[in-house]
Curated annotation (Swiss-Prot):
<protein>
    <recommendedName>
        <fullName>ATP phosphoribosyltransferase regulatory subunit</fullName>
    </recommendedName>
</protein>
<dbReference type="GO" id="GO:0006427">
    <property type="term" value="P:histidyl-tRNA aminoacylation"/>
</dbReference>
<dbReference type="InterPro" id="IPR041715">
    <property type="entry name" value="HisRS-like_core"/>
</dbReference>
<dbReference type="GO" id="GO:0005737">
    <property type="term" value="C:cytoplasm"/>
</dbReference>
<comment type="similarity">
    <text>Belongs to the class-II aminoacyl-tRNA synthetase family. HisZ subfamily.</text>
</comment>
<dbReference type="InterPro" id="IPR004517">
    <property type="entry name" value="HisZ"/>
</dbReference>
<keyword id="KW-0028">Amino-acid biosynthesis</keyword>
<dbReference type="GO" id="GO:0000105">
    <property type="term" value="P:L-histidine biosynthetic process"/>
</dbReference>
<dbReference type="Pfam" id="PF13393">
    <property type="entry name" value="tRNA-synt_His"/>
</dbReference>
<dbReference type="InterPro" id="IPR004516">
    <property type="entry name" value="HisRS/HisZ"/>
</dbReference>
<keyword id="KW-0963">Cytoplasm</keyword>
<comment type="subunit">
    <text>Heteromultimer composed of HisG and HisZ subunits.</text>
</comment>
<comment type="function">
    <text>Required for the first step of histidine biosynthesis. May allow the feedback regulation of ATP phosphoribosyltransferase activity by histidine.</text>
</comment>
<dbReference type="InterPro" id="IPR045864">
    <property type="entry name" value="aa-tRNA-synth_II/BPL/LPL"/>
</dbReference>
<keyword id="KW-0368">Histidine biosynthesis</keyword>
<comment type="pathway">
    <text>Amino-acid biosynthesis; L-histidine biosynthesis; L-histidine from 5-phospho-alpha-D-ribose 1-diphosphate: step 1/9.</text>
</comment>
<dbReference type="GO" id="GO:0004821">
    <property type="term" value="F:histidine-tRNA ligase activity"/>
</dbReference>
Length: 392
């Protein structure tokens, strides 16, 4: 390895220098304080867990994204977390064991094998919130509201909220009586939004009736504004009860969000299949103009706690603090800086600590550097250490 190579970081792994680090930490504290004001309790799961526990209920996508190492103590396979959700579900199911509604929040680094997000990072700082123990529309609306408030508090505007429901896709596929390979092919086409290929493939499926073909090819075209829900009712309302219930639920959620956040744009995509095997109800994502990737996303996942022996309804969202910092112009109010001689006396030591307790940033001068951005300096005047202005 050459000297130049020693400076390199792995692709998609970055570091924050002082100015950016101050912005990240300021936003992290601000958003966690916001979540606390909504009644969410902070949890700090470990960065490393046994792989089988870490991936429980998470689906194959997360398994591919997870870095794996061998535990030198036990010989078992460990995983470095790529997402917090299964960890928080384990905490709710195994550690807290509260039968009532539980609100939990988290923030920390995750590591992924493949880049994702606005800047192609593999090391985002994930922040999120979860509600356990409530399966009604009220908790869906609360989590959505907190997500939008989180983004607004971070300084983002012109938000667009994308809504969907996995029961609509699963209901259509179930009603068409397809085999596993056929379902997988359709899910692949829905994810790719490849409408011409979807139309061709639907015609090839000789097992379908004409109305079933209309359901399959019409589903990915159900995207747009609130009129989409009426179109969905017209096209899919007679398929089965689960689809009708999903459309009604989306109507209730969207009505509540429009009332609370009238400036947020609303968009529906009823064939959205992000984390299809993972979520069980309403799914959602937030976007800002000019960026194709979601800046926050979430949804309902009622089955995730079952593998930990305690199945509870759950819903939540997550975002990347570093991505939010990159999208906003965060101003961090810096404390006034005081230059101090090296604290060689008890009086100077007490004065420096007193100023720090008042919110000043007191820096001991270790060499002959210039005052720089300092605002004050400590000088011994009239038998006491006093603040004196620095004239730059």
């Amino acid at each position: 390895m050459t000297l130049a190579d020693r400076w390199l970081l792995p692709e998609g792994v970055d570091e924050a220098l002082p100015e950016q680090a101050a912005k990240i930490e300021h936003l992290r504290r601000t958003l966690l304080n916001l979540h606390e004001s909504w009644g969410y309790h902070l949890v700090i799961p470990p960065l490393l867990e046994y792989l089988d526990s870490l991936l429980t209920g998470a689906g194959s996508d997360l398994e591919i994204e997870t870095f794996k190492v061998i535990d030198q103590l036990s010989g078992r396979l460990l995983g470095i977390r790529a997402d917090f959700t299964s960890q928080v579900a384990r905490i709710d199911a195994h550690c807290l064991k509260d039968d009532g509604v539980q609100r939990l929040s988290y923030c920390g680094s995750v590591l992924r094998t493949m880049p994702a997000g606005l800047d192609g990072t593999r090391s985002p700082i994930q922040l999120g919130a979860e509600i356990y123990g409530h399966g009604g529309v009220e908790s869906d609306v609360e989590v959505l509201s907190l997500m939008l408030q989180t983004l607004s508090t971070a300084g983002l505007s012109n938000l667009v909220l994308d809504l969907g429901h996995v029961d609509i896709v699963s209901g259509v596929l179930a009603a068409c009586n397809l085999n596993a390979d056929q379902e997988s092919k359709l899910i692949e086409l829905y994810k790719a939004k490849d409408l011409p290929e979807l139309d061709r493939y639907a015609e090839e499926l000789g097992c379908l009736t004409d109305i079933q073909k209309q359901w399959l090819v019409g589903l990915p075209r159900l995207c747009g504004g609130k009129e989409v829900l009426k179109h969905a009712t017209d096209l899919l309302g007679d398929v089965n009860e689960s689809i009708r219930d999903a459309i009604v639920l989306l109507q209730k959620v969207s009505d509540s969000i429009c009332q609370r956040f009238p400036k947020v744009g609303l968009h529906f995509d009823l064939s959205d299949l992000v984390s299809y095997s993972y979520h069980t109800g309403v799914i959602f994502a937030a976007y800002v103009p000019g960026h194709g990737n979601a800046i926050a996303r979430g949804g309902r996942y009622n089955n995730i706690g079952q593998v930990f022996g305690r199945s509870r309804p759950a819903t939540g969202f997550s975002t990347d603090v570093k991505a939010l910092v990159a999208l906003t112009d965060i101003v961090v109010n810096k404390p006034k800086t005081v230059l101090s001689p090296i604290c060689s006396s008890d009086e100077l030591w007490q004065k420096a600590n007193s100023l720090r307790a008042e919110g000043y940033r007191v820096v001991e001068v270790l060499d002959d550097i210039c005052a720089g951005d300092a605002d004050f300096k400590l000088e011994f005047v009239d038998e006491a250490w006093q603040l004196m202005p620095v004239h730059n």
